């Protein structure tokens, strides 16, 4: 059995778990090949760390990502974080880490923004009911 690296990525309420093992470059998200994922915007987000890493690194590994929770874009960004962290851990290459950080810091560090809780007296976190009209 070869080497296996497990990493996680979170975005809003979406959680992704990536398993990276020796292989021939297969990338699957929820058991579906990455090149058939729709919408295209989500597919491009997931492909970003693979493109930056380069074909020579990606062709040596198989990546399986399981994502749950959140919306389709949050799931794509969570998968992207998990893949990027996994490839950095797999290669142990500080240059790859620097390339990810230069492209987008949130690819490795995550994005701390969360939904603000709703308060009483209005429809949302900040919106209030109208006091009077005329």
Swiss-Prot record:
Region of interest called Disordered, as start-end residue ranges on this chain: 109-134
InterPro entries: Ribosomal_Su5_D2-typ_SF (IPR020568), Ribosomal_uS9 (IPR000754), Ribosomal_uS9_archaeal (IPR019958), Ribosomal_uS9_CS (IPR020574), Ribsml_uS5_D2-typ_fold_subgr (IPR014721)
The keyword NADP is assigned to this record: no
Biased composition (Basic residues): 115-134
Any one cellular-component term (Gene Ontology): cytosolic small ribosomal subunit
Presence of keyword Ribonucleoprotein: yes
One GO BP: maturation of SSU-rRNA from tricistronic rRNA transcript (SSU-rRNA, 5.8S rRNA, LSU-rRNA)
GO MF term (any one): RNA binding
Alphabetized UniProt keyword annotations: Ribonucleoprotein, Ribosomal protein
Domain of life: Archaea
Family, similarity comment: Belongs to the universal ribosomal protein uS9 family.
HAMAP family: Ribosomal_uS9_A
Protein name: Small ribosomal subunit protein uS9
Species in which this protein is naturally found: Methanopyrus kandleri (strain AV19 / DSM 6324 / JCM 9639 / NBRC 100938)
